Every structure is written in C-alpha cells, then in structure tokens.
Amino acid sequence: MWRTRWEDGAPTFTRNDEFLYCHTRYETFLRVMGDFQGIFECQYSADVLRDWVRNHVDQVLSLGIPHNWFLQVRPGSTMPELRDQLLDDVICCPERLIVLGKCVIMVEDHYEETELVLCMGGGTRLYIYEPSQEILLLCARHLDELARYGMMYTEAVYRQPQTPFATRVPHDVVAMLLRHGHDADALAACVGEHHGRDVNFHTPGRHAKTLKLLTSFGCLTDCWPFEVAPAARLAECEMYVTLQLRCRWYLLGAVGSYRAGGFFDTSFLIIFDRFCRFYVVIVKSHLDRSPPLQRLAGEIYRLADSLEELFRAGLMKVYVRRRYEHGLRRAARLERNGGCVHMGEAARLHFTMFDSGVDRDYARQFRWLCRGDRFRAEMLNNWDGWDAFTIWQARVVRGDFAERRRPRSLGDGEEEDEGNDGRAMPVVRRRPPPMPRDDDEDNHVVPDNQNLEVIHDALADDEEQGEDDDDSGAEPMEPEENNVVPNVERRGGEDAVAARMAAGHESDDDEWEDLGFDLEEDTVFDLKDVDEWFEQRRLAEKERWHLGQRIVNAYRTEAEVSEAEVEARRINLNTDLSPEWVKSFDFREHFV
C-alpha cells in the first residue's frame, strides 16, 4: 500500500482529500444487508422488532468494517447497565430507541465482548451506547450506510485495543511516541528529540496528511500562516489556547501539507494537556460546507483521550459530528456538539430513493438496495448520485414507474383508449364560452322614467332652435371672454392636486415630533470624543492582555491539579471568555 512507502515520497492527489474514498466490497455489502434483512423489514413496528430480537437471541450479524466486528443479538432486558439510564437526556431530540444487542470482536477463533450496545431509532438509524462514558454515537444514518461504510464513523471503535493503528510510519518515531504516550512531560521531551520530523498522519477512510512535530509554540514561525504573524499575536494565540484548556499544555505538531513553494501550509494544530488528552485547534476555516461540517478558525475541541486512540482514529472527529452527551459533560471535555439528524426527516432513505407509493414496502426497498448493478469498482465516492440516476432511468426510459393517478370511471358514450395500454386518458375540462350579447341590447345607463319626458322635450327644443339659426343666415357669434376656458385652467385640476399634496407635506413636517436634537449638528464629530474612544479601547485591550498573562502564568506554574478541577474551570469560566481572544487565529487574509 502507498502509505507504507512514506519514506520514498508521499503520493500526490489531484482531488480534494475531504471525501470518503473507502467503502466495503459488494460481497461484504450483501452480507451485511442479508444479516440485517429481518430488522429492515420489521422497522414499521417497535413491538414486532422487539419480538424479532427475542426470537433471534445470540445470533451473530456482520457489521462490515472492521471485518472482525459483529453484533450479537440480545434484548435490553438482559443488560443491567441499561436499567438506570435515560437516553432521552443524551440525544438531541426525543426518539424511541430499541436495543438490538452488543458488539463483539472476533479474535482468532473466539468472540470478545465489548461494552458497546447497538440500538436502532427511526428510519433504521443505528446508535452505539457506551456505558463507561454515558454517550450515544450515531453509527449510521440508515442501514444502507452501515453496509457501505461499516463503523468507520464511530469513535468508540478506535478506543478498543483490538483495532489496528492507522498511523504507523515512520516506524521509529511512532514507536517512540507511543512508548511515552502516558506521561505528558516525557511525551513533550520525545517530541523535542524528533523536532521537524514528518509523520504520515492517517485517518481511516481519508487521505493521509502530514503531521510535523514541533517542540514549542514558538516554532510555528516556520509554518504558514504563523510566519507572517508578529510576536505579540503569536503570544496572544498561545494565551487563548491556555484560557480554553485551563491548565498546562504542550504542542504535538502542525497538520497540513507542503505547497509548491516549499513552505508548510498549516490547517490544524494538535495539542495535549497535562493529562495526555489530545485536542485540535482549527487554523484554516472551512465555510463552504453545510453547517454540520463547517469549521471556524480558533475552535478547540477534543480529538482523542489517549495517543493510541489518536493514532487509530486520526482526524475522524474533525470530519464527523456524531457524539451526543449531556451539555455539562460536553463543556467539561471540550467536545464538539453533535449535529441534529432529525431536522431533515424529509430526506429519509425511503423518501429519497423510492416512489411514494412504496415508501412502506420494505421488502421491495430491500431488493432495490441489493440490486446487482448498484456497485462498480471504479466508483471512488459512494452510490448516492448513481441511485438518483437509476431512478430516473427506471421511471423515464424503461417506463417502470408506479401509476399514482386515481382511475376514472367511464361515463355514458365514452370508450377506453386502446392506444394507451389499457389506461384511460385524462379528460381535459374547459370553461364554457361566454354567452353572446344581443345587438339590440343597450349598454349605457338608462335614465329614470320620470325624467325621460323632460329630457326628450329639451332635445326637441334644441333641434328646432338650431334649424331657425341655420335659416336666418346670420354670422356665427364670437365667444365672450368669460366663456373662453384657457389652457391653464384646463390643467388646473392637476396643478391644484399637486399644490394640495405639497401643502400636505409641509403640514406633516410642521407636525413632526421634536426629537430633542439637531440632525445637522450631530453629523459633525468631535475629534476629542473619537480620540477618547480609541484611548478607552486601547486601555481595555491592555488590561485584557495583562489579565490573561497572569492567568496563564498561574496555570503553567501550578504543581498539582486534578482533572475534575480543570473540567470545573472550563464549565464555569469558558462561558465568560472574551470573544476578542478567538480573533487571534483569524488568518483568512493569508489563505487563498
């Protein structure tokens, strides 16, 4: 495999390393789906699913990845560790969970039982409950994801000693670090001995990144973007990390990649505290992703509880957010908050892949998921895009789609269309045309009957007077000045309306409430006030700096402190931390 030849040179990838390129083979996919077929078809009822679990006790089901992980079917009534646990307080939203059994690991020719309990929620969501930490881990969003990727997203897998290490090379450096991984001071000294060495930091299912070992925080000046930061800003970044951890800590190294110019581009920092708990510091923001996957510069959260877990899981907790626990416990451990999987209920498996007419036909869904043309060896990502294309091809090209129109009963004189394969053509109903209007119909308003005779007589008198004037042959009378309407008066209505509107605006201005200040006067700034504001801001920054320096020195020099006390500090003090500290890691202007 290429990652075992790291000393000969790292491979070059032309694609982004954020996608998950690893998945199971088609044979493994079918084996997992076949083992969980009974559970998949019983998901419509919780009682039926519980009966299935009771009827298949001690049956072993494959979990895909890792290849030696299995599920031993067992009801929840046989597990005493679940009797006093309220899982509704842990999960983000209320959801009914049904216990399926415990996870076991095949070692040589026998099974070793773990404490991990597998539960199923709505839509075949699978959760792992870890009693020692009282947390819920989202194992898979649905059964199809479990068959494709197994348990690679589950962080509890990497806490088991049977799980192999993903980070192995260079062998001498990794072996030396693991030897001193339980003592913080000894581990920091070991990192100093191998200062500048590159470790092939591998995450299961992801492409490898380079972990450059660094002795102290000041050595970051050799890496981008810290080499452009002044000494004061670098010290502020160090103080911010100390104020987040609330104890003494050490730097393990910087995670990133080498650029064409030869410089090392840093994306993350890996640090560990005095209790050998490992954390990640985000340096490069990732805002072009969905909200559950966004990462902001300056965020600090726990990556692993030990160095062994770190070299097994890598940056898995950076890429996924699937841990659910109590809020105080999450704040004490600096864990990343898990995303809510109940917001997109419309994106469930049977809504995205199947027709609405078969959304409860689980047997048909199972056959569709296990079809033979779903897997191809050249597919590097997953099958989601090909599933959408398959639906389009099956429904449009082949005509294999469900008829959801209600059958129409034939009326009198109607016959079924023979050219439509026995299906009745829909009848297009049109609105009736408007009624024709009679020619003799009078469209104008007719006056009242009482005034009809008066109007008729007046019209007759006018006609007679006009005939007399024509017979007399007199010259037409010129109009008087008072009878002439000038053009200005013809537009008088419009001008009057405009004048009234202008007068109305003036009256509104006069009726405005006095606000107590002059707008024109306030537009002129007093330079003394501006200088005073900047002086106050400078004094506040100076006070914040001195206060942070005193707190950091106190944390560094304390001799003994328990982990519980440090966690209590994080719960009580991190909420009042000034947001100005996190801005020290904002290097967006230095990233392209």
UniProtKB/Swiss-Prot annotation:
Q: List the disulfide bonds.
A: none
Please list the residue ranges that the record marks as compositionally biased, kind Acidic residues.
460-481
Q: Does the keyword Metal-binding apply?
A: no
Region of interest: Disordered? 407-491
**Keyword terms:** Virion, Virion tegument
Q: Which InterPro entries match?
A: US22-like (IPR003360)
Query: Which superkingdom heads the taxonomic lineage of this protein's source?
Result: Viruses
Q: Where in the cell is it found?
A: Virion tegument
Q: What is one cellular component GO term in this UniProt entry? A: viral tegument
Q: Which family does it belong to?
A: Belongs to the herpesviridae US22 family.
Q: What is the name of this protein?
A: Tegument protein US23
Gene name of the record: US23
